[in-house]
């Protein structure tokens, strides 16, 4: 993934100026008026918004100051029916800081109706800035901004979305920014378009006119804004007209832990009626029921699927918890220490923080033992990394919050045993064959219980699920340990005191199916914690302290990544309304919200909130595809080794 570049913005006569491209970000004659003339009128958006019944999708090259987005959003909120939604996808390779963004918008929007919207955008703007996709639900949920930070062509190639309705081709002029306006970029614009997708751009350059014209866009040259003589607008006149998407109105979610609750929330807040079925007598009764947990990203020497997914998941978690009710879920201030507990991790930290793809200090920064102890509030053994965005949360409370939305029906104490598909609907049946619920689609979020379900699939995709035992210890706070300010992570973790006790976690035991508390494992957890934080060395009073613990079983996959996507029949690989979100492992707090959003986006036909390469790494069929690829490679090697005859 490409690195983000510093725009090195300057301010000239009160306007933001790019010394890299030697031009201002918006017109001196009036930024909002320019947006309205070039992009809104150029795409005839006011009249199109008024006719929109469902979702209108816009793609933009060059987010810049966010001015185009805000002026467009204001017009949409004014002109579109209340039932309509706007999905605005914008790419930016040189993103402004939040400070510069605010200054630019404060300057540009004086006296304009969109000024009232700028505060919400600024508050939600990513900080610190990292490469990747960043989804933001704004303005009462009617507008979704999907911000793609990175090189434009690369980011668009990662975008998985239904065809867009219109394009804002902004960015600096081709003469000043020739790398942007490439044939590869135009091909991505074409890929993400359908017949009658429109575009508008301030530029009338031949490279734009020819690049789009060769791909089937009808081009019209028309009057530009203010002193600019010409601009271009047009539409795609080839290809197929996309079929109207009819998202399901109802869904069944099986599983009442973090994963199922997240899917429920993501569907319900988009208007889907959800029936959530849980076998236990309460939500979050099993692995999601820990009283406290730590949401922390993974740091790797180079960006990997795992590290990028944890960054995306943590960003989404911050957005989710910024909504009403989120304050009650968060314990203390953000931040966590991760100590380098062996040479391998120390080398990994070193490369991840100081290499060419180094993360910004606001996200992760190295700390020596003295700095680590100061951050922790007590003495810790060794240095490591401080993650400023990490969170300590109440998982059970988060699960309950996610299922509190309107349109959610809870069925507790019901076990789904069999799934049927009849007349285009999914049915969930219990062991006696009684129908528990029916809906247009069904999501399995019941961890390893997926393996016990009877499904109407002729050749179901094999899911290599692994059941992993985890035991954590509740350690009563003492006078010294109570000073711990942030969680300390190593190959385990210690949380600050909550309700008079710390949580020390957690074992990760494959193939151990014992559900009883193991005192020896409690002792090992305690000894390991004391080795990193001496304040935890005292042995608690009482002979039964090792039994102040909790055991639960996580579900993970063979490659330690979640399994999220459409669950297809290998005999009929068309999507049939059956989906899965499971195998979150020990990272349920980080992954569950992201998996829930991705599942809802797949079901409802929305632009995906993570890169296509990441969503592909989560698909249920990935294990089968890898096995086929491995077998083909083995056959090829065998063929090459075969001796020649004759």
Regions found by a protein language model. Name each.
Residues 200, 304-313, 343-345, 384-400, ...:
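Short beta-strand to alpha-helix junction loop
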Residues 292-375:
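Dinucleotide-binding Rossmann-like beta1-alpha1 core, especially the glycine-rich loop
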Residues 239-270, 279, 287-294, 299, ...:
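Active-site substrate-recognition segment that forms the wall
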Residues 112-113, 117, 301-302, 327-338, ...:
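Helix-loop-beta segment of a Rossmann-like dinucleotide-binding subdomain
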Residues 412-426:
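A conserved short coil-to-beta-strand element within the FAD-binding core of flavoproteins
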Residues 104-158:
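S-adenosyl-L-methionine
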Residues 1-56, 73-110, 621:
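Rossmann-like AdoMet
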Residues 539-646:
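C-terminal catalytic lobe of FAD-dependent flavoproteins
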């Amino acid at each position: 993934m490409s690195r983000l570049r510093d725009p090195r913005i300057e301010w000239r006569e009160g306007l933001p100026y790019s010394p890299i491209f030697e031009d201002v970000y918006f017109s001196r004659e009036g930024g909002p008026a320019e947006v309205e003339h070039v992009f809104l009128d150029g795409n005839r958006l006011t009249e199109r918004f008024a006719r929109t019944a469902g979702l209108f999708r816009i793609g933009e090259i060059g987010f810049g100051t966010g001015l185009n987005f805000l002026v467009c959003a204001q017009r949409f909120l004014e002109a579109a029916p209340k039932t309509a939604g706007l999905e605005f996808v914008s790419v930016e390779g040189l993103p402004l800081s939040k400070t510069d963004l605010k200054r630019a918008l404060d300057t540009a929007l004086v006296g304009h109706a969109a000024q009232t919207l700028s505060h919400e955008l600024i508050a939600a703007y990513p900080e610190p800035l990292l490469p990747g996709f960043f989804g933001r639900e704004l303005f009462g949920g009617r507008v979704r901004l999907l911000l793609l930070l990175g090189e434009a062509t690369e980011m668009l190639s990662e975008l998985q979305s239904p065809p867009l309705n219109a394009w804002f081709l902004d960015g600096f002029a081709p003469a000043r920014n020739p790398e942007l306006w490439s044939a590869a970029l135009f091909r991505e614009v074409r890929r993400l378009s359908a017949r009658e997708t429109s575009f508008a751009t301030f530029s009338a350059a031949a490279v734009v006119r020819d690049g789009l014209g060769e791909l089937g866009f009808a081009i019209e040259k028309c009057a530009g804004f203010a002193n600019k003589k010409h601009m271009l607008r047009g539409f795609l006149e080839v290809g197929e007209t996309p079929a109207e998407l009819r998202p399901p109105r109802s869904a069944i979610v099986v599983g009442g832990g973090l994963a199922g609750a997240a899917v429920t929330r993501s569907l319900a807040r988009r208007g889907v009626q959800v029936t959530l079925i849980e076998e236990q007598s309460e939500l979050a009764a099993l692995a999601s029921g820990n009283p406290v947990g730590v949401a922390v990203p993974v740091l790797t020497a180079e960006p990997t699927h795992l590290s990028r997914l944890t960054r995306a998941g943590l960003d989404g978690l911050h957005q989710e918890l910024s909504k009403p009710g989120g304050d009650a879920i968060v314990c203390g201030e953000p931040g966590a220490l991760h100590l380098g507990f062996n040479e391998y991790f120390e080398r990994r930290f070193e490369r991840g923080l100081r290499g060419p793809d180094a993360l910004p200090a606001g996200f992760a920064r190295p700390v020596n033992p003295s700095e680590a102890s100061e951050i922790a509030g007590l003495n810790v053994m060794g240095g490591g990394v401080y993650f400023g965005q990490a969170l300590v949360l109440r998982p059970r409370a988060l699960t309950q919050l996610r299922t509190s939305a309107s349109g959610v029906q809870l069925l507790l104490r019901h076990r789904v045993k069999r799934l049927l598909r009849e007349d285009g609907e999914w049915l969930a049946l219990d062991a006696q064959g009684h129908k528990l619920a029916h809906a247009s689609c069904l999501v399995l979020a019941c961890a390893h219980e997926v393996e016990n379900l009877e499904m109407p699939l002729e050749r179901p995709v094999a899911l290599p699920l692994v059941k992993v035992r985890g035991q954590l210890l509740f350690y009563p706070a003492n006078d010294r340990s109570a000073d711990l300010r942030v969680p300390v992570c190593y190959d385990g973790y210690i949380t600050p005191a909550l309700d008079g006790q710390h949580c020390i976690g957690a074992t990760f035991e494959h193939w151990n199916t014992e559900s009883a508390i193991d005192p020896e494992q409690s002792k090992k957890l305690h000894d390991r914690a004391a080795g990193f934080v001496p304040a935890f060395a005292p042995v608690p009073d009482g002979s039964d302290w090792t039994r102040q613990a909790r055991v639960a079983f996580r579900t993970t996959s063979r490659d330690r990544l979640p399994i999220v996507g459409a669950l297809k029949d290998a005999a009929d690989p068309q999507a049939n309304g059956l989906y899965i979100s499971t195998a979150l492992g020990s990272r349920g707090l980080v992954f569950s919200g992201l998996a829930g959003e991705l599942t809802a986006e797949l079901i409802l036909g929305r632009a995906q909130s993570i890169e296509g390469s990441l969503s592909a790494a989560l698909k249920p069929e990935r294990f089968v595809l890898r096995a086929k690829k491995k077998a083909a490679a083995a056959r090829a090697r065998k063929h090459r080794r075969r001796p020649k005859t004759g």
